Amino acid sequence: MQNLKAGGYLIAQVHQLGQRIFAKKLKKYQIVDINPAQGRILFALWKKDGLPIVELAKVTSLSKSTLTPMLDRLEEIGHLKRVDSKGDRRKKLIYLTEKNKQLQDIYYKVSLEMKELYYSGFTEKEIDQFEDYLKRILSNLKEE
């Protein structure tokens, strides 16, 4: 038991507390209808709008069975829409709505606030090294 390290536990704590703080910051802007996991979907679509569900699942690391009800909810509250693919009518592409595009600036601002909070007291070199370590951990987990 003495050889166990606390990395996984610490990552989970950072994730949980970070989500709570992020949601609290969004609430200051009256954004209460979107949770942090849904924010991950929106962030992916802000980077590349019109993704098929399979690709969206991949970039968000969410299973299709988890993603589908989240997309249903975001569509229901008017933040995205599903559109038939012109090349394959069986495939649905996910697009942001105009209503959602207005949120992007707020999310960006809150994300910058979170970045400042996360990396307070770190040098650029330390941040780069830390993120490299996280990428390696993520890669290890994806191999499993």
Could you say what each language-model-derived stretch is?
Residues M1-V32:
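N-terminal leader segment of winged-helix/HTH proteins
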Residues D72-D132:
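Charged, amphipathic alpha-helical coiled-coil/dimerization segments
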